[in-house]
Amino acid sequence: MFQIRNYATKYAQSRALRKYPVGGVFHGYEVKRLLPVPELKLTAVDLLHNQTGSQHLHIDRDDNNNVFSIGFKTNPPDSTGVPHILEHTTLCGSHKYPVRDPFFKMLNRSLANFMNAMTGHDYTFYPFATTNETDFANLRDVYLDATLNPLLNQQDFLQEGWRLEHTKVDDPNSDIGFKGVVYNEMKGQVSNANYYFWIKFQESYYPSLNNSGGDPTKMTDLQYEDLISFHRNNYHPSNAKTFTYGNFDLNNTLQRLNKEYQGYGRRGSKKRELLPIQMKEDVSVETEGQVDPMLPPDKQIKTSVTWICGKPEDTYQTFLLKILGNLLLDGHSSPFYQKLIESGLAYDFSVNTGVESQTAANFITIGVQGCDEVDSIYEVINKVWEEVLQNPFEESRIQAIIQQLELSKKDQRADFGLQLLYSVLPGWVNKTDPFDSLLFDETLERFQEDWATKGDNLFKDLIKEFVISKPVFKFTMKGSETFSQKLDAEEQERLERKLKLLDEEDKKVIFERGKQLQELQDLKEDLSCLPSLQISAIPRVSKTYPLLEKDNVLNRITDTNGITYVRGKRLLNHHIPRELYPFLPLYADSLTNLGTSTEEFSTIEEQIKLHTGGVSTRVSVNPDAQTGKPMLLFQVDGWALNSKTDHIFKFWKKLLCETDFHKHKEKLKVLIRSLASSNTASVAETGHAFARNFGAAHLSVTKAINESLNGIEQLQLINKLSQCLDDEALFEKEVVSKLVELQSYINGSSDMKFMITSDSQVQIDAVHQQITGFLSSLPKDSKPCDFYSENYSMLENPGKPTLLQFPFQVHYTAKCYPGVSYTHPDGAKLQILSNMLTHKYLHREIREKGGAYGGGATYSALDGTFSFYSYRDPHALNSLSTFDSVPEFILNKSSWGEPDLNEAKLSVFQQVDSPMSAKNEGTILFHYDVTDEMKQRRREQLLDVNLNDIHQVAEEYLKQDKSIASIVGPEIPNFDALVQTV
C-alpha cells in the first residue's frame, strides 16, 4: 500500500518535471524554476509572464480540490480603508459581467467549496477552491475580469464604502446619517476589544502600514476618485501574483492569464518597503479603549513590549524566531506563561503576543491583558529574558516541537492548497522567496544539525542580537468607562461637520441619490452573462466512506499517512444532575489545564507533545437525527503515529481519572481568568451566532442545553465564577466541589463508544486491544443520577425581542423558528428555502439597503432550527421588521422560477459535497448517528425540492407565534416601546 502510494507520488513529481522544463515558455510564461518537495507530495513551478513581469506560482499536487488566486501588493496610503473598499467594489460588476455583485451571484451558480476576497496588511487577494474543472474555469474568468476590468460604479462605492443618506430613504425630512457596508463592518471590528488593541498597536509601532481595513473615523474622508486612482495604480499585471494548486491542467490557466494580460505592458515597481518605527531608545505609547464587562474594574489594562527581529526574507532565521517564540510562550512549561499568567499577574496573553512575520519586518511581542498596572509586568518580562540566557531549554521541549512539526506535515487537510496560499502570500509580496517557505525537511534538518552543534546558543544568540540592551516599544491600553460614548460622540460630530457643509441643493442630491440607489438595488437584472453550472453537475448518489463496527467501535481504513486518529464518546443523558450542566465545559477544559496529584500539567503537556499530535476533551450536545431529542456527549480525541497510539490511552486515563481539582485550585483560577478575558471578544466576532443560539434555546431542549454550555449563559457563569476567585471558601463551594462531583458522574466505561481511523487492519486491531485495556482501567459504572437530558427546560418565551447588551458599536440580530429532525422530508425544503431567501431577498434588504456587513437565513439540518440573522448591523430593529416581512414576500411578491431553485441547490451542495480530510471520513455517523442511508435520502430530498415545496414550508413553518427574536449589542433607547412595533 505504501509502496504504491510512494511510487504514484514520485511519478506525479517526475511528470511535472517533464511537463514544465526550466526555460520552457507556455502561453507567454517562462518557467524559471522547479522545486520537488517529496515530503509534501508536491512540485512547485515558478513562472514569469515575460510581457508584464507578472509572477505565477503553481503547486502541482495530486489533489482534486484545486485553488486559484490573484493577489496584488496594495500598500494603504492612509487609513481610509481604500484597499478594503476596493476589494468590495471590484466584485460589484465588470466589463464582461456587467451585473451588480457578480461575486455574490456566483455563490449560487457554482460548486466551489470556498470563495472569498481578503485584504491583508499590505496586499489584497481573491482566492477560490473547487473540485469541478468547469467551475474552476468559470470562477477564474469572473475573478480576473472583476480585478482587472471592474466597472467601479459610483453607486457601488457609495453602497460598499460609505455615503450620506436619509434614515428613511423615501422621506427627505428624516435624519441624514452615515451608511455603507465596509463602514459598518469596521465599526463592528472596532467593537472587538482585541482587534482595537491590535490595530492601535500597529498604528503606533508600524504607522507606515496604515489601516488597510479602514478606520471608521477616517473612512468618511475617502472620495470616489481616490478609489479609481488606487485601482489604476495597483491592480496591474506587473503588480499581480497569481497562484494555482492541484491537479487541473496549468496550461489552461496560463492561456487565460496571457489572454487577459494582452494590452498591458511591464511596469516598474514603485512600492516602497514598509517598516516599523526606527527606535534609538525605548518608546512608550498609552491610549484608552473599551472596558470589558466580563473583567473586574481594576483589571482593565492591556500592555505589551515589542522588539524588531530582522526580516522575513531570511526564512531560516524567521523559523528560529518562531521556535524561540514557541519555547517562550506556548504551553504550561513556557517561562512567560508561568511568570505572567500562571502567577496571576495578568489574565491572559494579549492578542499581539508572539512572533509576527507577515510584513517586511519580523518582531516579537510579549503582552498581557487583564492586569492592574504595567511596571511589574515589564519587570517580570526583563527578568525572564535574563533567566532564559542563564538556564538552558530542556532537550525534551526541543524534541517535542520537532515532533509536532513532523506530525503537522503528515496530518492531511482537505484545504491544504488554501493553507499553502495563506502561508506563502504575505512573504511573497514582501520579497520572501516562496520556494524557501516550502523547504520543510531542509529547514528542519538544518535546525536539528545546528541544535546538535550549538545547543542553546542557537537561541541565545538571537536574544542577544535582537532583545538584550535593544530599544523596546511599549504599548498600553487602559479601559475607559466613557470610551463607547466618545466613539459615538466622535461619529456624531463628524456627521455634523459634513452636514454643515451641505446647502439645500446638496441635500436634494443626497435624497435623490438615495432613492436611485434603492431603485438600482430593487432592479431585477438579466444574469445570462454569468456562467453557471447545471444541476446535472451534482451526482445523485452520495459519496460514502465504508465503516465497520465491532464491539462499539467504528473502524475506518483510509490513507492517513501513517497516523491513527482515535475518538471516544460517552452518552451522558442519564448521568449528570441538572444543576451541574453549566459546569461541563469548565470541567472538560480543566482536564487539559490542571494536573494530577503527582504531576504538574506542564510535565504532562510536554509528554503529550513528545508522543502524540494532541489529545483533547470536550462536551457537546447534538439532536438525535430521527427524534430530535438531545444527546449529551463527553468526548475525548487523540492522534499519533501508528507506533505511538498506546500513549493516547495513557494520557486519556491520566486526565480523566487522576486530575486533582483540590491540589490545582490556583491553576483552575488561572483557567477561569483566561476564559473570562476572551468572552467579550468572542461575542464581538460571532454575535449573530450567540443571538441565534439564545433564540433557539426557547424552541428546543437541545438548543437550551447548548445555550447553557456554549452561549450567553455560559459567558455569564464564567463571569460570575471569576468574581469569587479571592474567596477561598466560596471558590471551593461554587467551583471545585462541583468539578469533583462531575468527575464522579462522568468517569465510567458504560455507554462508551469509539471510532478509529487508520491505514491498515493490523493497526486497527492493535488499537482495539488498547481500547479494551483503557476501558478496563475505568470504573465500570459512574455515580448514579436520576435526571434525564430530555427533561431539561427550554428558556421561557418572553413574547417580544430580547436585547442582550454588550458595549459594541453595532448589533447582531436573530429570529428563530422551530424546524424538524434531520430525517423529516420537510428539512430539505427548509434548507433550500433558507438559501433562496438569503440570495434572493435578504442579502439585498439587510446588506445592500440596510448597510449591515452580513445577513440572511440559515437552516441547521442537524438541529432543526430555521433562523434569520444580521451581522454588524446598524439598524437592528429594521432588520427584525425585514424578517417579519418574509412570509408576505414569498407568498405575494417573489417571482422565483426554476433557475432560482437550481441556484439554491448548487449553493447548498457546496457544503454537502465539500472535500473532506481522511481523518474526518465517516465521522458524521460517530458524532450524530447519521447513517449513509439517511444521507442519501436527504440528498435525494434536496435535489427533488420544487417551488410548491418552498411555498408550502414557508407557510407552515414561518409563523410569527412560533418565532423568537434576539439582539446582541449596545443599548437601544426606548427599546421596550420600539419593539412593540416590530
Swiss-Prot record:
Transit peptide endpoints, chain numbering: 1-7
Function in brief: Degrades mitochondrial transit peptides after their cleavage in the intermembrane space or in the matrix, and presequence peptides; clearance of these peptides is required to keep the presequence processing machinery running. Preferentially cleaves the N-terminal side of paired basic amino acid residues. Also degrades other unstructured peptides. May function as an ATP-dependent peptidase as opposed to a metalloendopeptidase.
Subunit architecture: Monomer and homodimer; homodimerization is induced by binding of the substrate.
Catalytic residues, chain numbering: 87 (proton acceptor), 160
Organism of origin: Kluyveromyces lactis (strain ATCC 8585 / CBS 2359 / DSM 70799 / NBRC 1267 / NRRL Y-1140 / WM37) (Yeast)
Cofactor(s) essential for the protein: Zn(2+)
Protein name as it appears in the record: Presequence protease, mitochondrial
Enzyme class: hydrolase
Keyword entries, A-Z: Hydrolase, Metal-binding, Metalloprotease, Mitochondrion, Protease, Transit peptide, Zinc
Family under the similarity heading: Belongs to the peptidase M16 family. PreP subfamily.
SUPFAM superfamilies: LuxS/MPP-like metallohydrolase
Protein residues bound to Zn(2+): 84, 88, 185
GO terms of molecular function: metalloendopeptidase activity; zinc ion binding
Intracellular or extracellular location(s): Mitochondrion intermembrane space; Mitochondrion matrix
Lineage, opening ranks: Eukaryota, Fungi, Dikarya, Ascomycota, Saccharomycotina
Record's cofactor remark: Binds 1 zinc ion per subunit.
Primary residence: mitochondrion
One of the record's GO cellular component terms: mitochondrial matrix
Gene, per the UniProt record: CYM1
Pfam family, one: Peptidase_M16
Source organism superkingdom: Eukaryota
InterPro entries in alphabetical order: Metalloenz_LuxS/M16 (IPR011249), Pept_M16_N (IPR011765), Peptidase_M16_C (IPR007863), Peptidase_M16C_assoc (IPR013578), PreP_C (IPR055130)
The enzyme's E.C. designation: 3.4.24.-
A single GO BP: protein processing
